[in-house]
Amino acid sequence: MTPIVFIDRDGTLIEEPPDFQIDAYEKLRLVNGVIPALLKLRDAGYHFVIVTNQDGLGSPAYPQASFDGPNALMLQIFSSQGIVFRDVLIDRSWPTDNAPTRKPGIGLMVAYLQDRDIDWARSAMVGDRPTDLQFAENLNIRGFQLRTPQFGGDWDWDGIAHTLADAPRRAVVQRHTKETTIRVEIDLDGAPQARITTGLPFFDHMLEQIAKHAGISLQISAVGDLHIDEHHTIEDTGLALGQAVRQALGDKRGIGRYGFDPPQLPWQVSGAAAHGGFTLPMDETQASAVLDFSGRPYCVFEGTFVRERVGDMPTELVPHFFRSLCDASGMNLHLSVHGDNDHHKVEACFKALARALRQALQRHGHVLPSTKGAL
């Protein structure tokens, strides 16, 4: 789905003159900061639509020809810098006409309101007047009023671009079944912290490792049918956590996508490290994790356990948790472990996964890390 920034023209893209009509070339001046802001938003995946009231356009008071020249030059300037507008919607009525197509009315938006490919949750309206904020409210999207001497406002273009393009990646997932009730709250850019309660203290401890070593904020509350078995609680927690990660990532623009170790020198390669994954030692144990947020879930787990359980967590559910996590997050994970102590082996698996996650989740600009155009 595509987010759209709906943008007023006069006073927002171009400076508004005292007579409120840009009907001559010498009146055309861009608003400060608009081009770098739109480039940042473009790279973050936004499309742009101009929505403007042009009082009496086409009448003797405002001839069409007087409008067309400066408007065409404005569009050409933006296009020359890589900024293309998906549409230009113009209302030509007078304020006294009370036309439904005139902002803050949304009569011009009928086709967009019927478009199911628009990401309305991320879309926004930018303008210089209170009526632009009312227009945003009527569309149920976020509104930004640019700061101007004529109408006030609190925002500049740099702040708007930062707020929309660098928005925190957060998600809240609530999963209810006859067997479990689980709530996961995640902030991929928050300070590393964890509040975990699943009724299984050792499992809680392992989930805390993910938050700590992935560098994320994570809250999980799980109530399951532990009087029957641990299976449902551990499996459904993996599914809910994976769903939360997937939602928080959004369209995945700018992420590292892959989690792996830097290249190793030949004499540093041994054992599980030869797989090229994020390799982590824990005393006699070594675990390796490589992952890809490809959108194609696949989990390969290599390792065995001697004990039936570590603490209150059955060891047979360790690989099952990771498979559930992959299924719900759309992640491809290869995880291997070898060692002698089963406690060390389980903990090393969770830590290796977390460190690979840290690398894959990091943002590097706003480019989508795929030649397909979608992940």
From Swiss-Prot:
Keyword Hydrolase: yes
Catalysed reactions listed for this entry: D-erythro-1-(imidazol-4-yl)glycerol 3-phosphate = 3-(imidazol-4-yl)-2-oxopropyl phosphate + H2O; L-histidinol phosphate + H2O = L-histidinol + phosphate
GO CC annotations, alphabetized: cytoplasm
S-S pairs: none
Residue ranges, annotated region (Imidazoleglycerol-phosphate dehydratase): 169-375
Coiled-coil residue spans: none
One GO MF term attached to the UniProt entry: imidazoleglycerol-phosphate dehydratase activity
CDD domains reported for this sequence: HAD_HisB-N, IGPD
InterPro entries, A to Z: HAD-like_sf, HAD-SF_hydro_IIIA, HAD_sf, His_synth_bifunc_HisB, HisB_N, Histidinol-phos, IGPD_sf, ImidazoleglycerolP_deHydtase
UniProt cofactor(s): Mg(2+)
E.C. code: 3.1.3.15, 4.2.1.19
PROSITE patterns found in the cross-reference section: IGP_DEHYDRATASE_1, IGP_DEHYDRATASE_2
Hydrolase recorded as keyword: yes
Pfam family, any one: IGPD
Active-site feature positions: 8 (nucleophile), 10 (proton donor)
SUPFAM superfamilies for this protein: HAD-like (SSF56784), Ribosomal protein S5 domain 2-like (SSF54211)
Localization (cell): Cytoplasm
Region Histidinol-phosphatase, annotated ranges: 1-168
Positions bound to Mg(2+): 8, 10, 128
Pathway the protein takes part in: Amino-acid biosynthesis; L-histidine biosynthesis; L-histidine from 5-phospho-alpha-D-ribose 1-diphosphate: step 6/9; Amino-acid biosynthesis; L-histidine biosynthesis; L-histidine from 5-phospho-alpha-D-ribose 1-diphosphate: step 8/9
GO annotation, biological process: L-histidine biosynthetic process
Keywords assigned by UniProt, alphabetized: Amino-acid biosynthesis, Cytoplasm, Histidine biosynthesis, Hydrolase, Lyase, Magnesium, Metal-binding, Multifunctional enzyme
Family membership: In the N-terminal section; belongs to the histidinol-phosphatase family.
HAMAP family, sorted: Bifunc_HisB, HisB
Protein name: Histidine biosynthesis bifunctional protein HisB
Protein source organism: Xylella fastidiosa (strain 9a5c)
Recorded name of the encoding gene: hisB
